[in-house]
């Protein structure tokens, strides 16, 4: 964890964590991408998909989900032990869409998990290649972040729906490892901890016995991950308090919610990575591109260049706008769901709409949707500029933000002011500064009140032309400060239901 003095780059977390130089990191991330690409090509061959069908993002999602399910040890064990009617624990599958006589047809496929594992390992030189699996999990998580608002989940844990900018990675599975922990937002970590504490309150044995010891160490580990995301001493001290509590209860929940709210202004460090669907890596590999040899980075120009030269298609429902569908997927590809709209409009080079104004539902098609009226179209995933992804929250300051989302979590390391609604955030801090953490609370509130509207974050950082691979000439964009900054503004996005 960052605070433990073991600052490893996120690429190192994706690799084996050995200290590597940039070239080695690029090669090993490239190797991971190669493996995903080779696996995808093989699956398309198995399923006899045409080139067009193989580039359909819905088919990609099904194939990705199958391999993730095949390697989900815990769930597989659970399914073996609790057999449910009509579910074969040894099989996995999903909808595959094919073009037949000028129409899209849905076919439900079923495969042995063992067979899928074999194909995956074969594509990855015999390894389990957990990093490749995590990479796909993060892509699914980024897609969920761009598509759904987690209002219900926030309210259930006693948090406020306006804190949605803190919820990056809230749908990532537990098994996503260090790379997964790096991309989780402050709100996501707080929510996981609150759920844990609530179980402890309701179940006397939760913290006891052999299992309780494991639970306790998981709790402390999560506290440390969250602590590592905070950038101020007072917020970190507060996390120490929560972690050291002998019997975590309502006081800890209060402290956690307080620290989450404070992160709207005193932002945490959250990593951002451009994770693309497997149907982007597959065709690139089959065209002869060698990712391991060329090297690849998830936080630099590489994903932008790859998307410039990729054709990805999507099924479109009758009343959906293909441009809006493209925006949704573009945001997911760059992990930009909580980024400032003004900024990624600039990078993408097209006007970007807030979620509530998008005429598009999620990318996945439900099994009961009528296929007769489905069309397909090309997703426009190209960009005008590229920018380096950030893993810090940027320094903090104010500007008017909106009724829905009241803060941003920056994705790109580009100079701008960071909008949030100070009066709204501060209103949440009335009263309660007593108790064990009162001095920390007072200190945090003081820092928040001192945050200034005119401060600029990521000073001097800019976007780059796509021809500028070495990032030599930063272009610092200028923004209309009066413009709306947040994506979930006054929103009607669907809820995420597992």
UniProtKB/Swiss-Prot annotation:
Alphabetically ordered keywords of this record: Capsid protein, Helical capsid protein, Host nucleus, Host-virus interaction, Ribonucleoprotein, RNA-binding, Viral nucleoprotein, Viral penetration into host nucleus, Virion, Virus entry into host cell
GO biological process, one term: symbiont entry into host cell
Chain positions of motif Unconventional nuclear localization signal: 1-18
Record-given protein name: Nucleoprotein
PTM comment: Late in virus-infected cells, may be cleaved from a 56-kDa protein to a 53-kDa protein by a cellular caspase. This cleavage might be a marker for the onset of apoptosis in infected cells or have a specific function in virus host interaction.
Region: Disordered, residue numbers: 1-21
GO molecular function ontology, one term from the record: RNA binding
Gene: NP
Pfam families attached to this UniProt entry: Flu_NP (PF00506)
Keyword RNA-binding: yes
Motif (Bipartite nuclear localization signal): 198-216
SUPFAM superfamilies associated with the record: flu NP-like
Family of this protein: Belongs to the influenza viruses nucleoprotein family.
Organism listed in the record: Influenza A virus (strain A/Shanghai/31/1980 H3N2)
GO cellular component: helical viral capsid; host cell; host cell nucleus; ribonucleoprotein complex; viral nucleocapsid
Record note on quaternary structure: Homomultimerizes to form the nucleocapsid. May bind host exportin-1/XPO1. Binds to viral genomic RNA. Protein-RNA contacts are mediated by a combination of electrostatic interactions between positively charged residues and the phosphate backbone and planar interactions between aromatic side chains and bases.
């Amino acid at each position: 964890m960052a605070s433990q003095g073991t600052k490893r780059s996120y690429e190192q977390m994706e690799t084996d964590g050995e200290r590597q130089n940039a070239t080695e990191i690029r090669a090993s991330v490239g190797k991971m991408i190669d493996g995903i690409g080779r696996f995808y090509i093989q699956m398309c061959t198995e399923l006899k998909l045409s080139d067009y069908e193989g580039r359909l993002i819905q088919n990609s999602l099904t194939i990705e989900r199958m391999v993730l399910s095949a390697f989900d040890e815990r769930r597989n064990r659970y399914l073996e032990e609790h057999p449910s009617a009509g579910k074969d624990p040894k099989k996995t599958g999903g909808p595959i869409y094919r073009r037949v006589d000028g129409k899209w047809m849905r076919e439900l496929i079923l495969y042995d998990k063992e067979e899928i594992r074999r194909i995956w390992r074969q594509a990855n030189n015999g390894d389990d290649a957990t990093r490749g699996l995590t990479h796909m999990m993060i892509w699914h998580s980024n897609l969920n972040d761009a598509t759904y608002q987690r209002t219900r989940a926030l309210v259930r844990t006693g948090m406020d729906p306006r804190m949605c900018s803190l919820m990056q990675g809230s749908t990532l599975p537990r098994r996503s490892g260090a790379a997964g922990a790096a991309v989780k937002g402050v709100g996501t970590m707080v929510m996981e901890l609150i759920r844990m504490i609530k179980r402890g309150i309701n179940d006397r044995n939760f913290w006891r016995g052999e299992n309780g010891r494991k639970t306790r160490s998981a709790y402390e580990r999560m506290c440390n991950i969250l602590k590592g995301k905070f950038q101020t001493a007072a917020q970190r001290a507060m996390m120490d308090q929560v972690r050291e509590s002998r019997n975590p209860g309502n006081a800890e929940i209060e402290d956690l919610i307080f620290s989450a709210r404070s992160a709207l202004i005193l932002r945490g460090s959250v990593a951002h990575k451009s994770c693309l669907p497997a149907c982007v890596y597959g065709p690139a590999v089959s065209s002869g591109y060698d990712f391991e040899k060329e090297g690849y980075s998830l936080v630099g120009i590489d994903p932008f260049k790859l998307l410039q030269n990729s054709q990805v298609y999507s099924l479109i429902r009758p009343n959906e706008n293909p441009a809006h569908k493209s925006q949704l997927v573009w945001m997911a590809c760059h992990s930009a769901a909580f980024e400032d709209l003004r900024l990624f409009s600039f990078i993408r080079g097209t006007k970007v709409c807030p979620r509530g104004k998008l005429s598009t539902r999620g990318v996945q098609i439900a099994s009961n949707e009528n296929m007769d009226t489905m069309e397909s179209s090309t997703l426009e995933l190209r960009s005008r500029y590229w920018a380096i992804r950030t893993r810090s929250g940027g320094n903090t300051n104010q500007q008017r933000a909106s009724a829905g989302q009241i803060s941003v979590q920056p994705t790109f390391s580009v100079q701008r002011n960071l909008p949030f609604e100070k009066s709204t955030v501060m209103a949440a801090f009335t009263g309660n500064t007593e108790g064990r953490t009162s001095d920390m609370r007072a200190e945090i509130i003081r820092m928040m009140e001192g945050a200034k509207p005119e401060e600029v974050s990521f000073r001097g950082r800019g976007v780059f032309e796509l021809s500028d691979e070495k990032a030599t000439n930063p272009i610092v964009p200028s923004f209309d400060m009066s413009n709306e900054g947040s994506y979930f503004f006054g929103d009607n996005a669907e809820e995420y239901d597992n």
